[in-house]
UniProtKB/Swiss-Prot annotation:
Under oxidizing conditions two disulfide bonds are formed involving the reactive cysteines. Under reducing conditions zinc is bound to the reactive cysteines and the protein is inactive. GO terms for cellular component: cytoplasm. GO terms for molecular function: protein folding chaperone; unfolded protein binding. The gene is hslO. Gene3D superfamilies: helix hairpin bin, Hsp33 domain, HSP33 redox switch-like. It comes from the Bacteria. It comes from Neisseria gonorrhoeae (strain ATCC 700825 / FA 1090). Pfam families: HSP33 (PF01430). This is 33 kDa chaperonin. It is found in: Cytoplasm.
Length: 302
């Protein structure tokens, strides 16, 4: 496979209609998706939902105005506890899920049944410079796509159509939206959104942007921009784990190491393991926190 083919397998493509105030984004992730699903043995229903949320995160990150990270989460109280996907302005992504691994999950189990009651959708913006912003709303809708449409109607008050799909081979998404502060004939918007709704889940997962946009809009073709390529990359590091341990405090961390000999932290996304033994922990806190936990006199370490 040549580099162009690889790139187009993991790309977000912007488009806009010159004759009406409507913009759109198409995303298809293939190699990135393969890398993510290899990290865990996801049940089929959860794998599908995670792929849809991943595609949604890449779509929504297309509207990032500043450098940073967009995080989308779905949290529930059923068999599925959490789905999370992250997309950065550097065009890297990662995603994972947490669920009750003792529960039986049917391949066709619905998102609502997986999440149980009182689910929430969380969208977080973490700019490289500045304070993070977070929005939390109750889950509304029977699918991730419908949930996002409801969220965007509430937050942006813009007519939006979102379609999401995930298969074993790829995750895909399509977003079509009115431009803000522009007048659009209702019949024109209805025409565009109706065409967008004819796209099947199979087509969305299988076809690249060129074929999707021709399939939908060949009679009134939009202006299409150069694809933006994405790759899978985890942002975990030993330094970030150290910061987390410092936040927990020397008493708690020292107690764990005194009892177990070390403390191990696994990354939920890429499964990297970070192990801190007695020497590591004492150096991190600048004192013999493990010794204190064992009942020895407190003293600093170099």
């Amino acid at each position: 496979m040549n580099q162009t083919a690889i790139n187009r397998a993991d790309a977000r493509t912007r488009f806009i209609f010159d004759d009406m105030p409507v913009r759109g984004l198409h995303v298809r992730l293939e190699n990135v998706w393969h890398h993510i699903v290899k990290q865990k043995n996801y049940p089929a229903a959860i794998r599908c939902a995670l792929g849809e949320l991943l595609a949604a995160g890449v779509l929504l990150s297309g509207n990032l105005k500043n450098e940073g990270t967009l995080i989308v989460q779905v949290q529930g109280q059923g068999k599925l506890k959490m789905l999370v996907a992250e997309a950065t302005s550097d065009r890297t992504v990662r995603a994972t899920a947490r669920w009750d691994e003792t529960a039986e999950i049917a391949d066709d189990e619905s998102l609502g049944d997986l999440l149980g009651g009182n689910g929430v959708f969380v969208l977080t913006l973490q700019p490289k410079d500045g304070e993070p912003w977070q929005g939390v709303v109750p889950l509304e809708g029977g699918s991730i796509a419908q949930m996002l449409v409801n969220y965007m109607k509430r937050s942006e008050q813009l007519d939006t159509h979102i379609a999401l799909s995930a298969s074993d081979e790829a995750a895909g998404g399509l977003l079509v939206q009115r431009l803000p502060e522009e007048v659009l004939d209702e019949e024109a918007w209805e025409h565009v959104s109706t065409l967008a709704r004819t796209l099947t889940a199979e087509e969305l997962a299988e076809l690249d942007a060129q074929h999707v946009l021709y399939r939908l809009f060949h009679e009134t073709p939009p202006r299409v921009f150069e694809p933006e390529t994405f790759e899978s990359s985890c942002t975990c590091s030993r330094g970030k784990v150290s910061d987390m341990l410092l936040m927990l405090g020397g008493e708690e961390v020292g107690g764990v190491v005194a009892e177990q000999g070390s403390i191990e932290v696994d990354c939920d996304f890429c499964h990297s393991k970070y192990v801190f033994d007695e020497t590591d922990v004492n150096a991190l806190f600048g004192e013999d926190v493990v010794g204190v936990a064992k009942g020895l006199p407190r003293h600093t370490v170099q």
